[in-house]
C-alpha cells in the first residue's frame, strides 16, 4: 500500500451546501471538459448532489484539438442558461466556460481570440437575460491562461496556466456605473465583500 503524506481534507459548508440549507435552487452547467469543476470540485470533492441542485452536462466537441473548434460548446451551454434564467426556476446558476482554458492550452493565438470572442458573446446574452430579471452576475476565474501566450524569458509559446490576477466582476442594476478598482482580498477571503 502507498503511504499518503497528507490526509484528505474534508471541505464543509461549501457554497453549494449553504445554498441548499437556505432552500435555494441551484443549476450547475458546463460542457464535458469543465463539468467536474461545477459539480465535484465545487461541492468540495463530493459526488453527492444537495437537495434542489440540478446538473446539466453539454458534450464537448469531438475534435483532436480544441483550436479546430474554438467556440467549443459555449453557444449550447448559453442557450440552456438563458432558458433556465427565463424559466425562473433557479436562485443560483453556476457555469464554467471551457474555451479560454482549453483553447489556451493549444497555444494557437488566432483560435484563442475566436474562443474569447465566443465566450464574450455568450456572457453578453447571459448578462442581459439575468438583468431583465433583476438578478446579479458574478464573473471570475480560478486562474489565467488565454491572456498570456508568449513567455518573455524563453521566447516560446506559453500553453500553461498563469498566476496573473483574474477578474472579479459583479454586474447588477444597483451596481451600474460603479467601479471599485483593484482591491486586495486577503487570502482570497470573499466574506468581506
Model-derived features with residue positions:
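Feature captures the catalytic ectodomains and active-site-proximal regions of enzymes
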Residues: 1-193
